[in-house]
Every structure is written in structure tokens, then in C-alpha cells.
Amino acid sequence: MKHRYLPQTEQDQKEMLDVIGVQSIDELFSDIPEKVRFKGAYNIKPAASETELVRELSQLAAKNKDTVSYASFLGAGVYDHYQPVIVDHVISRSEFYTAYTPYQPEISQGELQAIFEFQTMIAELTGMDLANSSMYDGGTALAEAAMLAAGHTKKKKVVVSETVHPEARAVLKTYAKGQHIEVVEVPAKKGQTDLAALEKAVCDETAAVLVQYPNFFGVVEPLKDIEPIAHKGKSLFVVSSNPLALGLLTPPGKLGADIVVGDAQPFGIPAAFGGPHCGYFAVTKKLMRKVPGRLVGQTEDENGVRGFVLTLQAREQHIRRDKATSNICSNQALNALAASVAMTALGKTGIKDIAYQNVQKAHYAKTQAETYGLLADVEGTHFNEFVIKLQEPVQEVNKRLLEKGIIGGYDLGRDYPELQHHMLVAVTELRTKEEIDTFIKELGDRHE
């Protein structure tokens, strides 16, 4: 082999040229005018050996500020959670790792069962009747929920709280623009949805009301109070939720939600610089035939043996392209599998315990922050995030924290102009008391 990364030999090239009837590479490209051809040599270094390549890439990777070497208090939708060792072991199996969407389910029983288990666990966590096989991420899941609601109700207006993740709202607006759907944003009041403004925004033309639980500021929204407002005018109630929080919180399905969406990233999926992750989508039975994405169902073959199939496929583009309610081809099955393995490894008790640790440690950090006068004017119960107010730009504070081996919180001023110098702090089960104390002291000493 002449080149390490280009396996064709001169004999291989000659055979290919003979097949197409030309004598040389130059003759192959003879129809390209001389004046537009590049002449000369590219300023590219010679190919590196494997050891040289590994060394160079390792040096580049070492420049990253990762959550293994640094204590991370950054959340805002992507969290530093423990990943059970078994997750990577299972998803690395070749039959899972390289498998594509199972168009022939009779020969993909293992993959279909894994997806079915994911659907079952998500439905149980959310308190809904069924869930699909996954979405791209939490943002697209929320947007797809709004599109489902608009199609189901035949209305062209959706109302979304400003306490919903800003990036999810941006995705929603992108979807809505193409469908000529009006997106109305309801303001926040002390970190929660302003219920008076919400009631005023909802009308008979509203297809859906969208809220987040816990919301972007970490506050647990009062779904019991929002539900009757959301269903006014027969609109659908859509809740975007952190699935880990549902280990402790009342499931949205038991509080009147019609659609529950979110991102399964907290379960066995690394932050990975923002993705890929795994959205989930759960609904009530009445919306079953309008769910986007694949659905795996359980059945029996002619011998009475349990089997799994892709069901309700008439919704999908490879069956009825012009009338499809689903245009997601290759879903996030591998990440859904990772989430399934993590949830299975933890079990109900484990999920509840980790959720409790998140609450406990976040509230300890919040209490410590309060002693320095750092807390922002935000009301309500928190899960694992809360807001603090600083006396200087968050970006400058985070630069100093990095020098101390700490990844600071999210700069809320990026998305909310009125929240300059406000930081969203996330505290997961991985943070120790020493890390929390050091982090809060670094902030507090500059604040006094």
C-alpha cells in the first residue's frame, strides 16, 4: 500500500481507468478548462504516523476544560451526571452500535425490544399512556409537540412561557415560521410563568400552551394552576420536563398534561459539547396516531411467541410521504438505548435517590449562597438549579473560576437582557461539599 490512508495502488487506479476507457488521471479530467484548474501544491504536512497522530490529538484534547478535571456548576439543559459503567459496555455491542432503523422488524427483535423498554420507562416516568422511540433532542421534541397540537386542534397559535429554555423556544419559532403558526411568549415573574399574563394570552384560537417543569431557572412550575388555563378553549397542555426530576416530582401526566416532552440526557448520555442527545415524546392515548417518530409495539406471532414490531407506520414518510406526521428517519436509537440502560441500572429507587441528591446538594449550595447575599429575586421550589446575582459580568467571573479549576454557571444575560450579571447555577449528585463550598466562597468573597 503506497499511502497509509489512501489504499488504492497504482494497479487499482489503472484497472478503474481501463473500465471507464481513459488512459490516465489527467485524461479523466481533460474536460475541465486549464484556466480553472489549480496548479501547484497544497501547503499540507505529510501524513502522520499513528503514534504521531495520537500524540497530536491527545495534546489538542488536553486543552479542553472537561467535567472530569474541573468541578462543573454549568447546566442550562445539559448536566454533569454519573453514567453507570454498564452503559458504554452495552451500547458498544456491534449489533446495537452499528444498527440502523429496523425496517425489517422480524430480524431486529433485540433492537426493537430495547426501544420498547425505553418507551415503557419514559411513559411510566411521565405518567402518560405511551411514548415514542425518541426524538433528536428536547428542543425538537417541544417544537414537534406544538406542531402536533396545531394539527390536532386546527388552530394556528401557540402560547409558550419565557421560562422555557431559550434554545427550545428558538427551535419552536423556526418550526412555526414554516407552518405559519403564531408563537406568543408569556413573560416570567420572579422566575415563574406569570399566570395572569398566561390567562390573558390564551384564547379560543390557541392550539397549545407550553411550559417547562422544572423551568429554565430551576423553579418547579405550579402545573395544577396552569392546567385549567391551558385547557381553556380546548387547547392542548404541553410540558417539557427533566426526566430525572420526575423521580421526585408528580408526573405531568397526573397533572393534566396532554403531551410531555424533554431530553433524556440526564440518563447515561454525556454532555458531549451539547450533543448528540435524545429527546423523548409522550402523549395520552387520544393522540397516539399523531405522534411523530417511530413507535414500537408488542405483539405475538402465529405460535403465540412474544414479538416486537414497528406499529402505526402509516404515519411515517416511507409509507405515506404526503400525509406523514413523522419525518424523522434515523432517530436517536443509540442514545435512547443508553438512557434505557442507565434507567434500568438505577431502577426506581436509584432514580429517586439521585434526584433527591440533586435537590439536597442544590439547596445546600443555595443556602450557602444566601449567606453572601448572592440569591436573585426568584421565588418557588427548586430542583437542581437556582439563580444568583453578581456585581460584575458573569463572563469575567467564569474566567476566574476556570483558573481555580471550576466551570461556572450559565450567563442568563445572553438570553434575558434584564438579567445581566445573573448566573444560573446547577448542582448535581457529582458535586461534593468541598467543591460547593469552594465555588460559593469564590463568588461570595468578590461580592462582599
Swiss-Prot record:
Free-text function comment from the UniProt entry: The glycine cleavage system catalyzes the degradation of glycine. The P protein binds the alpha-amino group of glycine through its pyridoxal phosphate cofactor; CO(2) is released and the remaining methylamine moiety is then transferred to the lipoamide cofactor of the H protein.
CDD domains membership: GDC-P
Record keywords, A-Z: Oxidoreductase
GO BP term (any one): glycine decarboxylation via glycine cleavage system
Pfam families hit by this protein: GDC-P (PF02347)
EC number, as in UniProt: 1.4.4.2
Protein name: Probable glycine dehydrogenase (decarboxylating) subunit 1
Subunit structure: The glycine cleavage system is composed of four proteins: P, T, L and H. In this organism, the P 'protein' is a heterodimer of two subunits.
Sections of the chain in a coiled coil: none
Family listed: Belongs to the GcvP family. N-terminal subunit subfamily.
UniProt KW Disulfide bond keyword: no
Record flagged with keyword Ligase: no
PANTHER family: GLYCINE CLEAVAGE SYSTEM P-PROTEIN, GLYCINE DEHYDROGENASE (DECARBOXYLATING)
Reaction it catalyzes: N(6)-[(R)-lipoyl]-L-lysyl-[glycine-cleavage complex H protein] + glycine + H(+) = N(6)-[(R)-S(8)-aminomethyldihydrolipoyl]-L-lysyl-[glycine-cleavage complex H protein] + CO2
Domain of life: Bacteria
GO molecular function: glycine dehydrogenase (decarboxylating) activity
